[in-house]
Amino acid sequence: MNQNTLDSLALRSDFRAIARWVEPRSTVLDLGCGDGSLLSLLGEELEVKGYGIEINDAGVLACAQKGVNVIQQNLEDGLRLFEDDSFDFAILSQTLQTIHQTAAILRETVRVGRECIVSFPNFGYWQHRLSVMQGRMPVSKSLPYQWHNTPNVRVLTIKDFEALAPEVGIEIQDRVVLHDGQSVRWGELAW
């Protein structure tokens, strides 16, 4: 494992869980790919053929510097570039809470990917609830921003996502709840 892979794993606790679901040598579309760290990791470890969609100039540049295929585009404009089932896996990794047209983008994700992987910070986590009860917006490893500089435009819980999933064509096949990068039982720390 090279230093870039180790750095990617250190940055995002959900990357390892996502990598477990992706099949070797598959095709992957990472929606809101940021600096391309997930695609770089999947390429190195699983030899996937990956593409990223990113709107941010710095993210696009970082992808290019890592050799990650990236298209600069706003997800809110849809995924008309891609035909149905263009990819084995379409991934929304810590992206869902940053977009306005959540249902539309989830439908597009289902359309272009044979399977979808979605990760998001759970605002229902008990420590986040406690912060709100104490009059403050939560700040944690999974929510590292203050209320005034967060890229998040949505707050959701695991149950919220489970309720929306059937409406947008998602059948949840598996799930993992993480706390500090470790898998926890479904009822222990999250709602």
Go through each PLM region and give its residues.
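S-adenosyl-L-methionine-dependent methyltransferase catalytic module, highlighting the catalytic core
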Residues: A103-E108, E115-W191
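Glycine-rich SAM-binding Motif I of class I
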Residues: G36-S40
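Conserved alpha-helix/loop element of class I SAM-dependent methyltransferases that forms part
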Residues: L9-R25
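A short SAM/SAH-binding and catalytic strip from SAM-dependent methyltransferases
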Residues: F89-H100
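Class I SAM-dependent methyltransferase SAM/SAH-binding core
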Residues: L41-G78
